[in-house]
Regions:
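Amphipathic, Lys/Arg-enriched alpha-helical "gate/interface" segment within cytosolic domains
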Residues: 1-128
Length: 128
């Protein structure tokens, strides 16, 4: 996935964001997730979306496994900033992340993994 050059981009430490037909798109970057950089990312997303949860299409990248505190904070913030999440990745990566974050309880928002971004966008449209 490459960044578009026909719309406004929002750069953060852990991702680049843009809108595509009302869906917030995220191109994940590879630094290790920490509570600090996740907090900064939450603030960035809130600013981009005017504090309104938005459906997210995220292109996952390989990054180091976050520690327990970062995983906990991340899962607590999901429903604050996103209404649903579609993860696009190589087969297996999104499933690994889902198992890592939600092994013991279901996700706080609708989440689904895809290998095809067109299918992911179609699924997210129900959350617009």
């Amino acid at each position: 996935m490459t960044k578009p050059n026909d719309r406004e981009l929002y750069e953060g430490e852990i991702a680049t964001y843009w809108f595509d037909d009302g869906i917030l798109v995220s191109l994940s970057k590879s630094p290790k997730r920490t509570v600090e950089n996740i907090k900064a990312n939450v603030q960035l997303v809130r600013r981009i979306t005017n504090n309104k949860p938005a459906p997210l299409l995220i292109y996952l990248s390989n990054s180091p496994v976050p520690d327990k505190a970062a995983r906990k904070y991340s899962t607590e913030q999901l429903p604050v900033i996103y209404s649903a999440m579609a993860m696009v990745s190589k087969p297996g990566l999104a499933k690994f992340i889902m198992n890592l974050l939600f092994a013991l309880k279901k996700p706080p928002i609708p989440m689904k993994s895809f290998t095809d971004d067109k299918e992911a966008k179609n699924w997210l449209k129900q959350y617009l």
